[in-house]
Each structure stands twice: as C-alpha cells, then as structure tokens.
A protein has these predicted regions:
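Small/aliphatic-rich secondary-structure junction motif
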Residues: 2-49
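General small-molecule cofactor/ligand-binding pocket signal
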Residues: 32-34, 80-84, 135
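Short, hinge-like loop/turn segments at secondary-structure boundaries
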Residues: 49-52, 98-99, 122-124
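A short acidic, glycine-rich active-site loop
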Residues: 51-67
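Structural beta-alpha unit
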Residues: 73-104, 129
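Gly/Ser-rich helix-loop-strand patches that form or flank binding pockets
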Residues: 102-138
Length: 138
C-alpha cells in the first residue's frame, strides 16, 4: 500500500476530481498536493486550442496556483500543499523522485489521438517518466 501520494492540481475540474478520488480512496495516507507554475509558458493550452491566445503574466499564473491550493485545502485539509516553479511535467516527476513518492494521482482531460500528439499531455508524460506508479483519473 502507498504511504505517500502526490496529487498535482491546477484548479481544473479534472485535477480536483483526482484530488477527491485520492482523498476518498487513500484516506490513511500522507497526501501532498502540488501546484506547478511554469513561468516559461505564454499561453494556456485551452486558450490556444480555442484560438484565443492570451499571455498570462507570472502574477496571474501564481494567483491560479494559489487558488488551486486553497481549493485543495478545502477538500483535503490535512494534506501538505506545495507550490513549485518550472516545466509542469518535469517538475511533478522531479518532486516525486526527490520525495520518494509511492503513487501519483493525476487528472486527465481525456484528449486522445491527434490532439494528444499535437498538444501533449501532462498526465501522459508524468505516467511515462515517473519513478512510481501513476493513477490517471478521468
């Protein structure tokens, strides 16, 4: 059984669903909620997909990360919350390695096929590179 679980959140419905799943299924486990701000990303992927590019200054990305962690605290008040900066997938994997995480529970938007190849998927990249099992919640 997993002793330490990492749940990356970005405030999306999918990441909150993954957190709720982790809280329900792993209530006796040390839970860490991680929000990653990538200062190098100029666009939100949803906005690029919708053809309405918008550049978010770092303050906005930080505000979103803070809001995601505040929401996480409502769902999992006993969880440790961590905010990190860097490329999202890489930062999640590195954190899991550094902290000897037993399991990562991550949400997925459920994109597949060409859109997944074109846009990439944080959940898919984490699943391929993580040092531990990854449970993807849809």
């Amino acid at each position: 059984m997993a002793e330490s679980i990492l749940v990356p959140v970005d405030g999306s419905d999918e990441s909150i669903k993954a957190l709720e799943y982790a809280v329900e299924e792993y209530s006796d486990t040390d839970l860490t909620v991680l929000s990653v701000v990538n200062p190098g990303e100029a666009y939100d992927i949803e906005i690029v997909v919708d053809a309405h590019p918008r550049s978010d200054p770092p303050e906005t990305a930080n505000e979103r990360a803070k809001a995601a962690l505040e929401r996480a605290k409502e769902i999992a008040p006993d969880a440790e919350t961590v905010r990190a900066r860097g490329p999202v997938s890489q930062t999640i994997v590195t954190y899991a390695e550094d902290e000897s995480t037993d399991l990562i529970v991550i949400g997925s938007r459920g994109r597949g096929g060409a859109s997944r190849v074109l846009l990439g998927s944080v959940a898919e990249t984490v699943a391929r590179r993580a040092p531990c099992p990854v449970l993807i919640v849809r």
